[in-house]
């Protein structure tokens, strides 16, 4: 099963580049086991509202918000590994 990762960001968010960087590292590590979608909440506000997000960056894994704020590499990799298993 492919794990779906959604990263919610905004252009003015100072922490969003860190979240994107760690997700990009995860994509390199896990390859085709994960599908990454980067969502700019200024463009796709509805999806953020559907998740009830009040802050960015936020990361949803398989439809569940798992992180608000930029997670550490180990935290994110562990959460992804849990979903793959």
Curated annotation (Swiss-Prot):
Q: List GO molecular-function terms, semicolon-separated.
A: electron transfer activity; protein-disulfide reductase activity
Q: Which SUPFAM superfamilies match?
A: Thioredoxin-like
Q: Secreted among the record's keywords?
A: no
Is ATP-binding set as a keyword in this record? no
Predominant subcellular localization, coarse grouping = cytoplasm
Q: List the disulfide bonds.
A: 13-16
Keyword terms, alphabetized: Cytoplasm, Disulfide bond, Electron transport, Redox-active center, Transport
TM stretches of this protein: none
GO BP terms in the entry: cell redox homeostasis
- List localization entries: Cytoplasm
Superkingdom, taxonomy of origin: Archaea
* GO CC annotation terms, alphabetical: cytoplasm
Task: Show where the Glutaredoxin domain sits.
Answer: 2-85
Gene3D superfamilies from the xrefs?
Answer: Glutaredoxin
Which InterPro entries is this protein grouped with? GLR_AS, Thio_glut, Thioredoxin-like_fold, Thioredoxin-like_sf, Thioredoxin_domain
Q: What does this protein do?
A: Does not function as a glutathione-disulfide oxidoreductase in the presence of glutathione and glutathione reductase. May be a component of a ribonucleotide-reducing system distinct from the previously described systems utilizing thioredoxin or glutaredoxin.
Q: Record's family?
A: Belongs to the glutaredoxin family.
This one is known as Probable Thioredoxin
Lineage, opening ranks: Archaea, Methanobacteriati, Methanobacteriota, Methanomada group, Methanobacteria
């Amino acid at each position: 099963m492919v794990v779906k990762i959604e990263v919610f960001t905004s252009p003015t968010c100072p922490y969003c580049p860190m979240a994107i960087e760690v997700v990009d590292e995860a994509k390199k590590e896990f390859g085709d086991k994960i599908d990454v979608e980067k969502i700019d909440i200024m463009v796709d506000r509805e999806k953020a509202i559907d998740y009830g997000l009040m802050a960015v960056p936020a990361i949803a894994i398989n439809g569940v918000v798992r992180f608000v704020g930029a997670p550490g590499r180990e935290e994110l990799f562990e959460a992804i590994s849990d979903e793959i298993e």
